[in-house]
């Protein structure tokens, strides 16, 4: 098993590094949000600074503490690509998280189990898509993983270092708390109330630093941090993001988690045979909820929203069973075993709720995936050999499946990257227009170090929840304050082309030929309709500035530059 684990870990790490080698230095934004973070890194040492006054130009919302922007600003000086410094931080942070996961699992289950878990992490979709992007999530996760590892040691100096790592994790991304809470709950279970001094001291220091940030920013940090947590939740979209890739990306891990939670013949266990039987029945119920997803994966004939809902029901069953193991679980030691694994799963599933917030994505599954891998890895060293072998095989399948499927992700194909590179046409056209320029695409300005006047996503969400009415921006548009405006629309396919016999026409690439509907605005990050009308009443399209980007064969994005109408 050791040699197999080494091979799988080598495959996973090599694949991740090869992807990073291609994409870390890529000069264009790969996913929305990178350019906003790039602008934050610029504003560390430039006007208007981080946390500008809300309700005034520039309409920007800085959701997180300043640690990552400062670090990205420093590292970015050594990169020739706009995003290279920030992506390098994220790449190294993701690799560090995998190493720490390996070391944590190694303590209880051996190096082979640790390597399997580390390899599984690097081949999970959320890390393949977000583990190297210029976003705060990978750094926050790596700091939290350092904290978890340090808390496993008894030495005071090591635990102080771990508390510092947790501190910076939270002040990199405020919602990175699941690993922190599980770690201190485990410490409390092992050492009793004396262990509470660690989380309470960390809380006190965190609140003091929060007060310091509020003081030095005249309250702006508080307003920005609170505002970002008031955005609407869209549960249907959240279910889609969380569970549409369950089959085949996460199914082996899901089964492995159940096998890890089902009790074995541990010392002190109450009616172990009955508990095991009940556990397998509950696992069967949860897997039964997911059967529709398996059928949909093999023969896509039903509405994906339906099987996403059933997968959600399966996770509700898992949540209930994990809660039951917390209330009932016993083990040879107070801090390890099934009970703390139940806590890990409850925290993992609770952390997944944030993916329902509008604009959230798979990066909100980072902690959930890590906690599930910790459960599986810990069980390998605890349960009977036959079940430990099955869990190991499931992790190996998870690695091999992710290794194969990652090559099918369309956003990283060469032709997709070539499409992205064409964005330079918009940036080149903007060179003749002086600041200020308004853009619905942050990359059009941030990549050349030009200031953003507005964060499209946060501005739209603030408008939708009634915290910004847009009247000040409309007044600026009426006064033609901006020398140019970059507008963005999208176009989705409306149906498939058919021949005279009613058969779907298949192109040379083997895919059906689509026909497209009209150009529309993005409901999440396009400017509100009344602001769009103000643009059209005061600006006109600049000839020759249209740029259409094919995201997929069935989805297009278009950009245009508009200039003031002569008066």
Predicted regions and their residues:
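Membrane-lumen/periplasm interface segments of specific transmembrane helices
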Residues: 19, 195-238, 242-258, 288-297, ...
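Extracytosolic helix-loop segments that constitute the early lumenal/periplasmic catalytic or substrate-binding loops
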Residues: 21, 35-60, 67, 74, ...
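Transmembrane-helix motifs of polytopic, lipid-linked glycan transferases
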Residues: 85-108, 146
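Hydrophobic/aromatic-rich transmembrane helices and adjacent perimembrane loops
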Residues: 91, 137-140, 178, 305-317, ...
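Membrane-interface alpha helices of multi-pass inner-membrane proteins
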Residues: 117-118, 145, 150, 159-174, ...
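Short acidic/glycine- and proline-prone juxtamembrane loop motifs at membrane-interface regions
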Residues: 129-139
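Extracytoplasmic
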Residues: 175, 394-567
């Amino acid at each position: 098993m050791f040699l197999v684990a080494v091979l799988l870990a080598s495959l996973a790490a090599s694949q991740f590094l090869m992807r990073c080698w291609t994409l870390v230095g890529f000069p264009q934004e790969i996913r929305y949000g990178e350019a906003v973070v790039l602008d934050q890194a610029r504003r560390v040492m430039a006007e208007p600074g981080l946390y500008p006054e809300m309700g005034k130009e520039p309409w920007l919302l800085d959701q997180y503490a300043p640690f990552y922007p400062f670090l990205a600003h420093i590292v970015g000086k050594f990169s020739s690509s706009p995003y290279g410094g920030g992506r390098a931080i994220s790449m190294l942070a993701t690799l560090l998280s995998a190493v720490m996961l390996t070391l944590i699992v190694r303590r209880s289950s051996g190096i082979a189990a640790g390597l399997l878990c580390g390899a599984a992490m690097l081949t999970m979709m959320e890390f393949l898509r977000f583990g190297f992007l210029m976003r705060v999530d990978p750094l926050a996760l790596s700091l939290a993983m350092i904290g978890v590892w340090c808390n496993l040691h008894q030495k005071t100096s090591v635990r102080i270092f771990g508390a510092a790592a947790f501190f910076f994790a939270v002040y990199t991304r405020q919602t990175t708390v699941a690993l922190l809470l599980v770690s201190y709950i485990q410490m409390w279970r092992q050492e009793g109330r004396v262990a509470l001094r660690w989380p309470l001291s960390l809380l006190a220091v965190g609140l003091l630093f929060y007060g310091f940030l509020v003081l030095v920013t005249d309250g702006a940090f508080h307003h920005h941090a609170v505002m970002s947590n008031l955005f609407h939740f869209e549960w249907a979209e959240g279910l889609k993001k969380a569970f549409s890739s369950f089959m085949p990306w996460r199914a082996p891990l899901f089964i492995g988690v159940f096998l890890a939670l089902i009790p074995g013949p541990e010392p002190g266990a109450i009616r172990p045979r009955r508990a095991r039987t009940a556990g397998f029945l509950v696992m069967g119920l949860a897997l039964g909820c997911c059967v529709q997803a398996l059928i949909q994966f093999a023969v896509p004939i039903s509405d994906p929203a339906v099987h996403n809902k059933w997968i959600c029901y399966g996770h509700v069953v898992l949540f209930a069973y994990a809660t039951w193991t917390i209330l009932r679980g016993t083990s040879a030691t107070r801090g390890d075993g099934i009970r703390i694994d139940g806590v890990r799963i409850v925290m993992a599933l609770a952390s997944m709720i944030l993916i329902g917030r509008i604009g959230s994505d798979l990066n909100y599954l980072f902690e959930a995936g890590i906690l599930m891998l910790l459960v599986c890895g810990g069980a390998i060293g605890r349960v009977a050999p036959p079940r430990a072998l099955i869990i190991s095989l499931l992790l190996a399948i998870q690695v091999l499946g992710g290794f194969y499927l990652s090559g099918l992700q369309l956003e990283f194909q060469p032709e997709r990257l070539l499409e992205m590179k064409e964005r330079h046409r918009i940036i080149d056209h903007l060179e003749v227009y002086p600041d200020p320029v308004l853009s619905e695409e942050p990359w059009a300005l941030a990549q050349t170090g030009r200031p953003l006047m507005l964060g499209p996503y946060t501005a739209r969400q603030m408008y939708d929840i009634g915290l910004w009415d847009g009247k000040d921006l409309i007044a600026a548009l009426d006064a033609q304050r901006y020398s140019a405006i970059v507008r963005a629309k999208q176009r989705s396919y409306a149906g498939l082309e058919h021949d005279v016999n009613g058969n779907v026409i298949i192109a040379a690439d083997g895919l059906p030929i689509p026909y497209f509907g009209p150009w529309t605005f993005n409901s999440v990050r396009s400017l509100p309709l009344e602001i769009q009308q103000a643009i059209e009443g005061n600006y006109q399209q600049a000839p020759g500035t249209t740029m259409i980007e094919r995201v997929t064969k069935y989805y297009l994005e278009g950009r245009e530059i508009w200039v003031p109408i002569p008066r």
